[in-house]
Amino acid sequence: MLRFFQPRLSLRRHLPGGVDAHCHLLPGVDDGAESAEEALSIIRGQQALGLRGAICTPHIMARYPQNTPAYLREQFAQFTSIVNRQSSIGNFRLHLAAEYMLDEAFPRHLASGDLLTIDPVWLTQPQPPNLNIPEGLGVALAETGKSNIQNSTSSIGQSTQQFLLVELPQYLLPPGWQDMLDSILAAGHTPLLAHPERYLRILEEGDLRALAARGIALQGNLGSLTGYYGSRVKAIAQSLLADKLYTTFGTDSHSYGMLRQLKLTA
């Protein structure tokens, strides 16, 4: 009941570029949108909130063995062809990345070199005062107002340094997880840890701050700031935000219903 009465969170402040940097709207590939119709509903919901684009971040993990980069690119191409036929949606920019679980299969994914990364220019935002942009990415972000990429899966025009969105299990730290983060850095990418504030059972807030100090970028869930995941998660998210430790935010929407429940406003 308390969640219903909470004030709505302004996206203009937390997504100044108008791009949802984490959502599961690519239909039928993971625990997100189940159909193209539902995915289109999510996009319309994002547009109603004033968003101009989204980065699709389907899971790559053992639970979804079919989710190889090649398969996801194919599914993304099919979905964007559907989106482009929707006159009501208009010029909504879609990009494809992935959310990689740091599990036993991750070292093989990284070694393959075929990764679905996030290009900083996709965020289409100058560096806002409440976000922490790692050194080397600020210039790319400052140039994003000139970007006109749409429905992109290509590496053409990408910035040199890329974000690789990764996540941890909620209940148990995997063996070698810090070594995996180091290997991402060694490969020339910036690890972008998804929803760090939600890892209450496995990491303390001090651990998150230590990761940020090591060059690990943090991506918050907007729902964490509205109390969607509970008061403890909200408190950690507010603390990290106050100290400018977040690099990006995303809705992490898995359905249109979830997007509505996040209590967001333009």
Give, region by region, the residue ranges found by the protein language model.
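Extended substrate/RNA-proximal surfaces in nucleic-acid metabolism proteins
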Residues: 2, 66-141, 148-216
